[in-house]
Amino acid sequence: YIGYDRTAWAGTEDPELRITFDRNIRWRCDRLTLDMGDDGKRLLPEDQILMEVKTLGACPLWLCRALSAQHIYPASFSKYGACYKEMCREANAPARMTNSKEAHRCA
């Protein structure tokens, strides 16, 4: 289970622009049905928020400038991959990850 609290914004002039902010990203490996609540272990410190910018074309210049002024630059991050690594770390097992669609597990 992976849960997070999301705030989503969409462009008014560019409907293809979407920015999301995910807070309180949490995970668990038990109680996997949705009726078991939304608690879990934090993936990131409380003061960190994941921002994702989605657009079909190039990022608008005004947004590039605003992000650059705050020293925010593109980076890859996968909530699912990070949770998998944490799960393997807790199990004291090496994470076996690949870019393929094939499923892998902790060994």
Model regions: which residues?
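Phosphate-end processing signature that detects enzymes handling 5′-triphosphorylated RNA
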Residues: Y1-A107
